[in-house]
């Protein structure tokens, strides 16, 4: 639905039967969103008309984290619950490339695919990780993989200069954005008794890197010296 911010009246409403589950992206007066059957839709923001839809493979078991959308210029990149990533050319309305994330965690094989939000830098390189066991750097234009490293998370990745910041459980990692090498890797313990530390988000400002945990704790890491923490 679209609602007017002036009078809160409904401008238009579109029902397509299957619930939408992904994040929403808006590009050139069109909305892009994925439903729980791994089908992506393009909807006109002005009148709610359906421009087109594109269906991909879908599994019975799924999670909302399976479906992530990002846009770079006129390239629409998205993941689905089948462990795939697609790039659609929004001008030609066709598949530019697609990749399959192979499950690499053999000891505890995840049944449901979960992905981080897709992050794209100014040069057109996307970064994504998943519970399938790897973090990837991929060129948006061609789909070629710059590097893949055996690190897993479903928390949002952060780009800071030539570094990628990652959190997984109680661990904070810094990866070289160009090479995929690990620059910093440290686990933290809770200051609270009988409490386990699990990071859930990162905030970055001039004063430092804030690692926010599930138990309301926050660890501050110095931007210039990662070993300097509070």
Model-assigned labels for residue ranges:
Residues 9-28, 49-73, 94-122, 144-161, ...:
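Extracytoplasmic beta-rich repeat domains
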Residues 142, 207-208, 213-230:
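C-terminal closing repeat unit and adjoining cap/tail of repeat-based domains
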Residues 1, 41, 86, 95, ...:
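WD40 beta-propeller blade core
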Residues 128, 136, 149-159, 165-177, ...:
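Flexible, glycine-rich surface segments
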Residues 81, 121-123, 128-136, 140-146, ...:
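Beta-propeller domains
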Residues 28, 35-36, 73, 80-81, ...:
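Structural signature of WD-repeat beta-propellers
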Residues 4-8, 44-48, 89-93, 139-143, ...:
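Short loop/turn segments that connect beta-strands within beta-propeller blades
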């Amino acid at each position: 639905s679209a609602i007017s911010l002036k009078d809160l009246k409904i401008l238009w409403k579109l029902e397509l039967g299957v619930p939408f589950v992904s994040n929403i992206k808006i590009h050139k007066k069109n909305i892009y969103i994925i439903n729980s059957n791994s089908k992506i839709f393009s909807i006109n923001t002005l009148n709610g008309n359906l421009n087109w839809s594109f269906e991909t493979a879908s599994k019975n078991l799924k999670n909302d984290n399976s479906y992530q959308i990002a846009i770079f210029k006129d390239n629409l990149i998205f993941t689905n619950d089948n462990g795939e990533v697609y790039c659609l050319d929004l001008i030609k309305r066709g598949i530019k490339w697609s990749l399959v994330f192979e499950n690499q965690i053999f000891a505890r094989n995840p049944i449901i695919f979960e992905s981080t939000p897709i992050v794209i830098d100014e040069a057109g390189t996307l970064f994504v990780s998943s519970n399938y066991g790897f973090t990837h750097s991929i060129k948006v234009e061609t789909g070629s993989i710059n590097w893949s490293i055996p690190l897993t998370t479903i928390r949002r990745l952060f780009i800071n200069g030539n570094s990628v910041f990652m959190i997984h459980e109680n661990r904070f990692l810094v990866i070289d954005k160009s090479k995929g090498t690990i620059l910093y890797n440290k686990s933290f313990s809770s200051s609270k008794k009988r409490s386990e530390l699990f990071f859930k988000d990162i905030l970055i400002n001039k004063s430092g890197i804030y690692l926010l945990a599930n138990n309301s704790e926050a660890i501050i890491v110095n931007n210039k010296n990662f070993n300097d923490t509070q």
